[in-house]
Curated annotation (Swiss-Prot):
Keywords: Cell inner membrane, Cell membrane, Membrane, NAD, Quinone, Translocase, Transmembrane, Transmembrane helix, Ubiquinone. NDH-1 is composed of 14 different subunits. Subunits NuoA, H, J, K, L, M, N constitute the membrane sector of the complex. It catalyses: a quinone + NADH + 5 H(+)(in) = a quinol + NAD(+) + 4 H(+)(out). Its EC number is 7.1.1.-. The lineage of its organism: Bacteria, Pseudomonadati, Pseudomonadota, Alphaproteobacteria, Sphingomonadales. This is NADH-quinone oxidoreductase subunit H. Belongs to the complex I subunit 1 family. GO terms for cellular component: plasma membrane. It is found in: Cell inner membrane. It is an enzyme of class 7 (translocase). The chain crosses the membrane at residues 21-41, 87-107, 120-140, 166-186, 193-213, 258-278, 283-303, 323-343. One of its GO terms (biological process) is aerobic respiration. The keyword Cell inner membrane applies.
């Protein structure tokens, strides 16, 4: 696209800037629309699990319910508590929402369909996603209320705890594929696993890490059964208690954007991304972006299924799972994958 704008007479710097802005909008605007539909799907899945109808009034089959909710929130007044730190109170949801968007810059939807195909894409994802904890901490502190503050402390401890496990899981993936580039990680899953399984993206050696990543992603995004940050019986609405109007909506948008991101990362890192499930010629007639979103939606259904069926963990159980189970397991798997590669790939 930069070359196209240059052909129209724009200098290279301006052509690059305009093409980058267009690329950001092409990703951000559909993502916001996807969040609205994902919220609708989430509510429909919960309703089906509880033998209810769910949203069914606004629009055909209730499809416009999320947009009606968004319009209602947009028209509400933003109320700032008298004792709150006004500047930080308004900044916190912006941080959370912005971080949820910038990570998508390196997510490849199909071959060549990525905003920034950088060689440290996976490292960028880990670094950028870890910034989200600041939005939570600032919200809890700036609200100047005990319930948001307690919730922010819980959220910070929870997010930091499971980021460690996720980091070691990502190291296992990098060792296997030999690259931090997200597109290269997907292409690295084309090879037949162990030379005899003719399938894309399914790696028996990394499968336990796929499970660890999925559960850790639920904890990282504070989804049930790990939503201890907003346990209604203890902390009212968590660190969002004092928020209303669009500032509250930004947290919701950021949360669901992060959920979609984690589902997409799971598909990219462990299940072949845009590659078809098996190496069968007719499956290549389906565009790669369709395979990517099909896998993403499957994992989102798993997220919603777990949320509707699994009871909430106690906080001590949550921390024990992260530090005493997932951390040792993921660290052990780094050594296991390293040893396997030394014996098989490098002939040591």
């Amino acid at each position: 696209m930069t070359a196209l704008f240059q052909s129209w007479g724009l200098p290279y710097d301006w052509a690059w800037f305009v093409s980058t802005i267009i690329g950001i909008l092409v990703i951000a605007l559909p993502l916001m629309l996807a969040v609205a539909m994902i919220i609708y799907a989430d509510r429909k899945i919960w309703a089906a699990m509880a033998l209810r109808r769910g949203p069914n009034v606004v629009g055909p089959w209730g499809l416009l319910q999320s947009f009606a909710d968004g319009a209602k929130v947009f028209l509400q007044e933003t109320i700032i508590p008298a004792a709150a730190n006004k500047g930080l109170f308004l900044l916190a949801p912006i941080i959370t929402f912005t971080v949820a968007l910038i990570v998508w810059a390196v997510i490849p939807f199909a071959p060549g369909v990525v905003l920034a195909d950088i060689n440290i894409g996976l490292l960028y994802v880990l670094a950028a996603s870890s910034i989200g904890v600041y939005g939570v901490i600032i919200a809890g502190w700036a609200s100047n209320s005990k319930y948001p503050f307690y919730s922010a402390l819980r959220a910070a401890a929870q997010m930091v705890s499971y980021e460690v496990s996720i980091g070691f899981v990502l190291i296992s993936v990098v060792l296997w594929t030999g690259s931090f580039n997200m597109s290269a990680i997907v292409e690295g899953q084309r090879a037949h696993i162990f030379g005899f399984i003719n399938g894309y993206g399914f790696n028996p050696l990394l499968f336990p890490m796929a499970v660890v990543f999925l559960i850790s992603a639920m904890a990282e995004t504070a989804r049930t059964p790990f939503d201890l940050t907003e346990a209604e019986s203890e902390l009212v609405a968590g660190y969002q208690t004092e928020y209303s109007s669009m500032s509250f909506a930004l947290y919701w948008l950021g949360e669901y954007a992060n959920v979609i991101l984690m589902c997409g990362l799971n598909a990219i890192l462990f299940w072949g991304g845009w590659l078809p499930p098996v190496d069968w010629a007719p499956l290549y007639m389906v565009p790669g972006i369709i395979w990517f979103f099909a896998k993403l939606l499957f994992f989102f259904f798993v997220f919603s299924w777990v949320k509707a069926t699994v009871p909430r963990y106690r906080y001590d159980q949550l921390m024990r799972l992260g530090w005493k189970v997932f951390l040792p397991l993921s660290l052990f798997w780094v050594f296991l994958v390293s040893g396997w590669l030394m014996l098989t790939r490098y002939g040591v």
